[in-house]
Amino acid sequence: MLVRAAVLGLLTVLALVCAHPTPAAAADGDVSWRVRTGANAYGDDRSSFSYAVNPGGTVEDTMVVTNRGKAPLRLAVYASDGYTTDAGQLDLLTRDKKSTGVGAWTRPKVTAVTVAPGKSADVPFTVTVPENATPGDHVGGLLTSLEQADTAAGINVDRRLGLRVAVRVGGELKPRLAVEDVQLDYHGSAGPFSKGSATVTYTVHNTGNALLSGRQEVAVRGPFGWLRTAADDLPDTPALLPGERWKVTVPVADVAPGVRLTATAKLLPLLTDASGSTTPLKPVEASAGAWAVPWTLALIVLLLIAAVTAIVLLARRNRTRRKAREAALVRDAVKAAMG
């Protein structure tokens, strides 16, 4: 179950069942309700709504709303498109935002439902896929909503509780992930023989038409593949909808300053079907380079070279002077012998 909250004059709490068959529930004081999938030909114990539909096709299903409070409960009912948040979780557009996908295709038979205390009510709905719908995965949700005034905070509280609606539209499925905008920054150490660290950033872009996550590998290496260092324990990317992007920042420790470094970000795309099984696809990767000059060591080497050069020049000068003195002594001795 996923719970998200946002306060912008309107506080929204959204619960989406994404992986577990436990019904989604909301509770606040004496107000409490839950939602679950109806038991029918699609299944008796589903975690969410999931369909495979051809363009122009229609499916009918039911969401069940249960009032667990002590007073009658009236809830608004509507559908909305899904998207991946900056935190990597699925959320749904608020009611004031226009939906163009699953949120527009999903039509509940009622726009509001009143449920007696301790009772349940069925909310039938239809999902109609347009003839011109793009093949592939589309995600949204069917929501119940209760708006209450919070006089202490001076805002309205819109509590939303819903279930995910996933639709795979028939046609050619093209699952593709791309690694884009790879950048490498090296952070050296003051020690002449110490290793530094690197920061690798890149963007994961779902360029296909299927819902995909990716298993990540990041490594930094020197020339000819030497001095390779890999990042440890990278989590999988969140499941991205077609067209979505996810920015990644990976720190890599203990990187040797190999003068010219190359960072490679590699992704193993993971395709999950309606049954929950995962299929790995062909890996994709991209690289970027950066300079990593060990300046302290370079300075020491330059000083050593300068010192050796000075010693050699001084020795050469002394040798020249000694030879000149010896030649003068020889000349003087010859003159004395002949005089």
Positions of predicted regions on the chain:
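Beta-sheet-dominated interaction scaffolds and their linkers
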Residues: 34-69, 112, 179-195
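Cytoplasmic C-terminal tails of single-pass
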Residues: 321-339
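Short, solvent-exposed loop/turn segments enriched in Ser/Thr/Gly
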Residues: 56-62, 120-123, 135-141, 160-162, ...
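Secretory targeting and sorting signals
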Residues: 1-27, 303-316
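Short proline/glycine- and polar residue-rich coil/turn motifs
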Residues: 55, 113-121, 235-246
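Surface-exposed binding patches on compact interaction domains or structured appendages
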Residues: 27-48, 70-122, 224-227
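Terminal connector regions
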Residues: 71-98, 122, 128-176, 255-300
